[in-house]
């Protein structure tokens, strides 16, 4: 190939002469070739193709936004976010508010059908965060699940950074609280299904007349406190149809699905009681060494489960072993054994025990469900005290004012949802699927109580449990989610008060310590298991902010060190307006899978 610049010609000449310039030329050419080869080799290892190899795209798939969108829409304040995973749509949003400080922000999301050689065609417009009083501009993130293309989820984050005291007075809040707004919206269908055609005939001329499967909207709002939970869409949406929400006090797994009346294929997504461990002794428990590869990438110490060949002990035996194990542990500590040596054999109980309902102090001893019990007994197993499960079906009612509001007012644990269709009509919640006609939307919520879990782990599994006084604050980070086994691995950072170790003479007052607890939560059974318990690290002169900053950095380092890349199609697509809040704009909207750019 002929050199395209003077420097390359000189490099080539040096190469021909074999002098010093030639050596440098060979190095330069070799370095460029080696770079490409290394990149292609990395594709084999990671399964992902770096977009840096193809920054210069052919002009036929590189179009200007001004050429495909009418100026009226640009003047109306449309902020374009990016391509959908399928490449069929480009998404944008608008925000509007009044001129005074007491006006609310109103957000709308838009789907535009994209064709390279024609202008964008608007196919859907919806209002986000139904009827919420939003007083400041939000950080927006629009996400798509790895394989579920039927809906998108929109997160709105309020950072409390605007108008200071006026904002606090109006919202009766302070800088220690932040509002989280969420809307889940059905994606426009490629073609009109039979139910959509029926809706169009019932409401001629109304573009929002869609069936529930292709035209639902679900909204909720909750408030988080300091230390504000990290936003982890890659983990929170890793399981299709499910979103994990950290509310600061609990981890809520929400599953959203649409079904038709009389559909025999209805399948419960969360908290399926029939997924309890089977009876054969050769089948290990969920966290026995044989089952440990559920999280192969994290390399953490898994507290061993009971041997697979051993029978399940009765509740009385479990409590007796727990008592003996506590005595054994205290004796080991009195002899000055290292902390890592005080973890007990699996046969002795607390370190290897699953947190079953039978181990709760207020639970009767007969609540444990034996592994060899019949299926009927498994389906009637009581809920562990640290979880709450609800399932509501939302249906569209023709009559107004018939919703039984009082039936659902007493539930203070589950997140409140408002479900509407595209025409703005509210859907009525029902607990049973009886007497349903047409389509209905099902919302499942499985809630894990953080403080309950913390107390249980310290009580059963912490070697320093006898030193523990109380915890003052905690922070939760999701380390991994396995969509095949429905296991969620979380890290709980703790600030706590505890008495010093017995070896420290004269120390009678408790000190402040930091530690972390790793816990695996099963979305099928609701049961959690202790993976590992960290040692106590004394907090000396550090602020809580510096403690949480170091803790989160350690979590990021752990996740990145053991990260196993997903296949190119198994990623969470994420679009955000972060650039707008930084005072700049995106340069391009890129569809990396189809090598298409829209230049802004």
Curated annotation (Swiss-Prot):
Which pathway features in its UniProt record?
Protein modification; protein ubiquitination
In this chain, Zn(2+) is annotated as bound at 193, 196, 211, 214
Please list the residue ranges that the record marks as compositionally biased, kind Gly residues.
Answer: 14-27
CDD domains, per the entry: DCAF15-CTD, DCAF15-NTD
Q: Where is the composition biased (Basic and acidic residues)?
A: 334-343
Q: How does it assemble?
A: Component of the DCX(DCAF15) complex, also named CLR4(DCAF15) complex, composed of DCAF15, DDB1, cullin-4 (CUL4A or CUL4B), DDA1 and RBX1.
According to UniProt, the name of this protein is DDB1- and CUL4-associated factor 15
In its UniProt entry, the species of origin is given as Mus musculus
- Underlying gene: Dcaf15
